[in-house]
């Protein structure tokens, strides 16, 4: 997007947010990340700079909120659940200054084809889903398992660009 930026390694614990509504959960995580980043900036000359925070989570067909998989078995469980079904991906983006903050949440529905045990195992062992919400990256090899999306593709990648632009 051609925007000069600096990454701040904020220390907000996403697991501290206990919420069953995916929209509210995503917002609370982003607000926590933003507060943490702002606290780190408050002691620097960059205090007045705008801060962008974002978070992506997945709402499974069984109505569970998940982020990044904990291990290979968790990845397998998620992919088995997504196989032949539709799930939702939620991302919240927030831009803040010391005076104000603007926030937007985006939902995208993602449908997967039926995946064989072998396909799931091959994908999990490739480690393509490590560190990715829902245990997959639509922009990589997992894209071949997606039959349709309803909403923002960039939301599923991890940053809903149109939502960000419209803030």
Where are these regions (language model features)?
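N-terminal G-site helix/loop of the GST-like fold
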Residues: 1-9
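Short, acidic/turn-prone active-site loops that include or flank metal/cofactor-
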Residues: 9-16, 161
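Anionic-ligand binding patches
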Residues: 20-165
């Amino acid at each position: 997007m051609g925007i000069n930026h600096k990454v701040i390694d904020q220390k907000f614990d996403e697991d501290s947010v206990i919420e069953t509504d995916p929209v509210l959960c995503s917002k609370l995580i982003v607000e926590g990340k933003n507060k943490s980043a702002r606290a780190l900036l408050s002691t620097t000359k960059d205090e007045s700079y705008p801060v962008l925070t974002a978070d992506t989570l997945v709402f499974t067909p069984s109505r569970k909120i998940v982020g990044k998989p904990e291990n290979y078995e968790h990845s397998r469980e998620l992919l088995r659940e997504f196989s032949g079904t539709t799930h939702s991906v939620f991302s919240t983006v927030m831009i803040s200054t010391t005076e104000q903050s603007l926030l937007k949440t985006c939902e995208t529905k993602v449908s997967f084809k039926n995946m064989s045990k072998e396909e799931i195992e091959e994908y999990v062992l490739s480690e393509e889903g490590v560190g990715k919400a829902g245990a997959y990256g639509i922009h990589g090899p997992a894209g071949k398992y997606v039959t349709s999306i309803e909403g923002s593709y960039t939301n599923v990648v991890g940053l809903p660009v149109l939502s960000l632009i419209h803030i």
